[in-house]
Design a protein with these regions (language model features):
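A basic, amphipathic helix-loop patch mediating RNA/tRNA/ribosome contacts
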Residues: 2-35
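Fe-S ferredoxin-like electron-transfer domains
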Residues: 29-234
């Protein structure tokens, strides 16, 4: 894949839905790059639109320009980010992922690069009732979901138990169904955006253990709710 080839030569392409252990999905569109490919006549021609580097295979003769070298790619990524943030809540200080969130980090990088720093969205942000309790230990904040589907793909492809599903289409649809299988739900809390809260860390519980991920120390361990007993690094 283009995104893996870029990693090997030290070129960073932002992404949210991509994960090396999961099959490509190109959901978030944040890794768009400017691509030119050789045709049958050997002439290299640019593709009409930016392409997701997480779902495109690297081939001989390709010419790839990332956000660092292409204004087209940079504009496409900035536009994607603007759409992601239109309805995203500004609650980073109380979010479990505050301080180590890829969405937050990339937004700050774009602002530092001179991209659009103030929203042009003047309507009311979309909201959902919260929290939605998926299991006794996992709470879902649907306002924070960016529809990357990493949780859905993890369940389907890693333990092979599709215990969670995303229903509907479009920005107003995030509806999750746990399908009554919480055995592997412990893996959800490791997701990159703070839409899943561990109940002990949730600020509404009144627990003395209230904190955020960035304040935790990582130690080797085994997730209590993992039926696989796979090693992990809980905080």
């Amino acid at each position: 894949l283009l995104i893996r080839a870029a990693e090997k030569i030290g070129v960073r392409i932002p992404r949210f839905c991509d994960h090396p252990l999961l099959a490509p999905s190109a959901n978030c569109r944040q890794c768009l790059v400017d691509v030119a490919m050789p045709g049958r006549d050997g002439v290299v021609r640019p593709m009409p639109k930016p392409q997701p580097s997480c779902a495109m295979t690297a081939m001989d003769g390709m010419e790839i320009n990332t956000q660092a070298t292409s204004e087209v790619a940079a504009k496409a990524q900035a536009g994607t980010m603007e759409f992601l943030l239109i309805n995203h809540p500004l609650d980073c200080p109380v979010c479990d992922k505050g301080g180590e969130c890829p969405l937050q980090n990339h937004a700050l990088e774009l602002m530092a690069s001179g991209a659009q720093s103030a929203t042009r969205f003047t309507d009311v942000k979309r909201t959902f009732p919260k929290p939605l309790r998926l299991t006794s230990n996992i709470l879902l904040d649907r306002d924070r979901c960016i529809l990357c589907q990493r949780c859905v793909r993890f369940a389907d492809q890693i333990p092979g138990d599709p215990f969670i599903a995303l229903q509907g289409r479009g920005g107003g649809h995030p509806s999750y169904d746990m399908d009554g299988h919480p055995e592997h739900a412990g893996g959800l809390y490791s997701e990159q955006i703070g839409r899943f809260d561990a109940r002990v860390l949730d600020f509404s519980t009144g627990s003395a253990e209230q904190t955020v991920d960035a304040d935790l120390q990582t130690i080797p361990g085994v997730p209590a709710l993992s039926a696989l007993g796979a090693p992990t690094g809980p905080g």
